[in-house]
Amino acid sequence: MHPKIILIHPPVSKPAEPPAGLAKLAGCLHANGIGHEIIDTNLEGLLYLITSPVPETGENDRWTARAGKHREENLSALRDGKIYQSRSRYQRAVADINRLISRAGKAYSIDLSLADYRDSRLTPVKSGDLLKAAETPQNNLFYPYFAPRLENALKENPEFIGFSLNYLSQALCTFAMIGFIRRRNPRQKIVLGGSLTTSWAKITGNKNVFGGLIDEIVAGAGEKRLLDLLGCQDGKIDTPPDYRSFPVHDYLSPVTILPFCTARGCYWRQCSFCPEKAEGSLYLPLSPARVLSQLQTLGGQMHPGLIHLVDNAVSPAILKTLTQNSPGVPWYGFTRITP
């Protein structure tokens, strides 16, 4: 069965765990019986660069040669907990992998690492540069990877292709891929969501400033709008995340890490730099009992080694519940310490 929608996680962000937002959308789509596919082009694209021959740049240094020789060994080590017993071995493995990625980026005037993407010619904070990235997808560092990958995706004839744009380090690659899709199929419906997209929408008053390139801008939680677009107006929205469409064993972590969000927005909302307050986002928490139940269910289904609570700040109520009632899986997150 052809998927009605293909959801894409674009490069570049840390490839340590599945993206929480797309996992939540996947859970909603699955609960409503809507065919979908998830493509983590961030993970796939970075692995493509790491395992590809190092571009010739006139520099033939020993570090790059060593990194290339041990690339598979280093990738395996980062997925095996043993290397984390030695800080120096871990640091060397990460440095060697970053060396290969950095050299690949240098050929395109890109400052690239496992966590960042900076183009010396284009900036993600200028709409004109984003449009330029869309107009010239062949100039993107990841083009040799995403061109055939997206060609195959288009052959599945999805009704929509959606991109989850959360960080500035993803913006130029997102628009390059959107531009490629527009070239191959001008009629393909494209949806753009994610936290960075939400911030832009608040600035522009929810106006689609990329009309003609992007069909739909989704600000905030995407479940309701996505179901409406897919003709499921009365579908289930409050559903747990679904990680079964993600290659959970391919991420660069010693154990499977599952991100989980216990609330939308932030319970504190008083930090001077808070985007939730600036954007007028509501605080919509799950009940502690529901959080515990969903975490226990996910633990039984996926057998993760770690749960990452991705809230801006984990609330005292959730902390109390999880310390008194173990979800069965180690967990961590960030919270506010109040004197």
Indicate residue ranges for each PLM-predicted region.
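Glycine-rich beta-alpha loop elements in corrinoid/cobalamin-binding modules
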Residues: K4, V12-E56, S113-P241
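Conserved SAM/AdoMet-binding glycine-rich loop
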Residues: I5-V12, R187, S199, L292-P339
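A cross-family glycoside hydrolase active-site/sugar-binding cleft signature
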Residues: I8, I39, S164, V191-G193, ...
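Flexible loop/turn segments at secondary-structure boundaries
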Residues: S13-A16, G45-L46, S169-L172, T198-W200, ...
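Conserved, mostly hydrophobic/aromatic
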Residues: L29, C266, V291, L309
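Non-catalytic, alpha-helical, charged scaffold/linker segments
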Residues: T41-D111
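Canonical Radical SAM [4Fe-4S] cluster-binding loop centered on the CxxxCxxC motif
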Residues: L252-A289
